[in-house]
């Protein structure tokens, strides 16, 4: 009986360890900006839903929020290549609009992505543009 209990406990621990290090999926995950050169960390972390984005596989739509406005558009995936298309957004005027402008410019420059664990990085060729963290729900 003790052998079975020990074996069951070992299997459960192995299963837990195996799932802990898995990469998040681009689609179906809420991503929050963690680091971008043009936006100070204080502006990024100001509100929980500032500088977030989500990719919806069902309709290949991307949607999110800057520090002021909401945005939406289409995306196309080819392996690790990513193209964001037809982005539109609400047009409220807010303080610190330069951060929103920099964020939207970055979205236009993205041509590929990489996910390691719960971290998403956008690239333009080999240049890292922004790093996002998966939001735990």
Language-model-detected regions and their locations in the chain:
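Short, linear, compositionally biased motifs with a strong N-terminal bias
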Residues: 10-11
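Lipid interaction determinants
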Residues: 2-6, 17-137
């Amino acid at each position: 009986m003790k052998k079975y209990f020990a074996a069951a406990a070992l299997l459960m621990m192995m299963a837990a360890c195996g799932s802990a290090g898995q990469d998040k999926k681009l689609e179906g995950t809420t991503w929050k900006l963690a680091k971008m050169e043009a936006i100070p960390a204080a502006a990024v972390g100001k509100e929980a839903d500032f500088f977030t984005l989500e990719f919806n596989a069902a309709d290949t739509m991307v949607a999110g929020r800057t520090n002021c406005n909401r945005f939406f558009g289409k995306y196309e995936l080819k392996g690790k290549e990513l193209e964001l298309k037809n982005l539109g957004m609400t047009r409220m005027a807010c303080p610190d609009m330069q951060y929103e402008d920099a964020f939207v410019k970055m979205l236009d420059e993205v041509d590929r992505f990489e996910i390691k664990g719960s971290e998403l990085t956008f690239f333009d060729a080999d240049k890292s543009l922004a790093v996002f963290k998966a939001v735990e729900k």
